[in-house]
């Protein structure tokens, strides 16, 4: 009989979002007429920006001609897209990131998982708690952890708490870690990292020869001009960080699929006594395992940076952040303790009356027909918290707030 990857058996009962779907399905089967409002999974709801749609339509027509047809594209992404990303997202902010250091992909979730392909299993790893579950689960799947304890913490991983007690700041650890996952603006808490905090992290990483995996998928939602959008705004980050970005939330590409990862050419790792270039390893990995993002989609992503695209993206981001403000202001006025929802599209709510995260999930589902995300699904430090997403229509967000406020 064929042998399986037994590391998958270490995973807790189910990935957070499939478990949410299971409970919704069970509830809906018993209550088929319930008008559910979903503020749980962070999927966008508004249409693709017009500039992106028009660019993709033109690309489709181009592909229908003999001269314009394109087959396999470069695994790293088309040069014209990488150049426009470099100029707009990095050089314009004082970051020394070239087009060659940008790898276009079909999702930051995929990249933050696949990056483990080029990193050794002996690395000492730290994650924040609460944490985006993908960071943890992919380390489990690839044999980098032991079993989970009763609260879901895996042996072999170290957890850095970010909570109301420490101002949702990821404190610099005293121990040495080889690999550190940071996500700011943070999913799920909505917290941000100041320039001073990121300077401290880069200093720590350089002193300890550590690698920071920096998830900046929500950088477009930052309102505070003092908050960095990229870790590469910090001097020295080129020597100790990889950054993941996505068009999913700012441009509505969750179903279209386009993202990118930045790996500076100056970034190094160790293989025994040999010093190795991480850029070359990732380039080799992508060339072997990835066929690239479609030409049509990349033309749509390129349009994000056009004059019209920038205006439309700004409007789209503002729409979702207005939703976040509606959530935060209504729940705060009703007596809930609410964090985030200022520089990120997520509100992180303290559950009332010491309810557990899943009990509050079931309570809102049954009493208000509103779906959110239990904080405990993001780690032990998320117990007693609940995440609501701003990704929905204005009508649904306002209706959901009316229902929840009535329950308080």
Curated annotation (Swiss-Prot):
Q: Which reaction does it catalyse?
A: (2S,6S)-2,6-diaminopimelate + 2-oxoglutarate = (S)-2,3,4,5-tetrahydrodipicolinate + L-glutamate + H2O + H(+)
Residues that, per the record, bind substrate: 15, 42, 109, 132, 187, 291, 387
**Record bears the keyword Oxidoreductase:** no
Q: What class of enzyme is it?
A: transferase
Entry's EC annotation: 2.6.1.83
The pathway that the record names for this protein is: Amino-acid biosynthesis; L-lysine biosynthesis via DAP pathway; LL-2,6-diaminopimelate from (S)-tetrahydrodipicolinate (aminotransferase route): step 1/1
Signal peptide stretch: none
Q: What are the recorded GO MF terms, alphabetically?
A: L,L-diaminopimelate aminotransferase activity; pyridoxal phosphate binding
UniProt KW Transferase keyword: yes
GO annotation, biological process = lysine biosynthetic process via diaminopimelate, diaminopimelate-aminotransferase pathway
Q: Record's InterPro entries?
A: Aminotransferase_I/II_large (IPR004839), DapL/ALD1 (IPR019942), PyrdxlP-dep_Trfase (IPR015424), PyrdxlP-dep_Trfase_major (IPR015421), PyrdxlP-dep_Trfase_small (IPR015422)
Q: Which cofactor does it need?
A: pyridoxal 5'-phosphate
Give residues annotated as binding pyridoxal 5'-phosphate. Answer: 72, 108-109, 132, 187, 218, 246-248, 257, 291
**Alphabetical list of SUPFAM superfamilies matching this protein:** PLP-dependent transferases
Modified residues annotated as N6-(pyridoxal phosphate)lysine in this record: 249
**Keywords, in A-Z order:** Aminotransferase, Pyridoxal phosphate, Transferase
Q: What does the annotation say about its assembly with partners?
A: Homodimer.
Family to which the UniProt record says this protein belongs: Belongs to the class-I pyridoxal-phosphate-dependent aminotransferase family. LL-diaminopimelate aminotransferase subfamily.
The record describes the protein's role as: Involved in the synthesis of meso-diaminopimelate (m-DAP or DL-DAP), required for both lysine and peptidoglycan biosynthesis. Catalyzes the direct conversion of tetrahydrodipicolinate to LL-diaminopimelate.
Entry protein name: LL-diaminopimelate aminotransferase
**Which species expresses this protein natively?**
Prochlorococcus marinus (strain NATL2A)
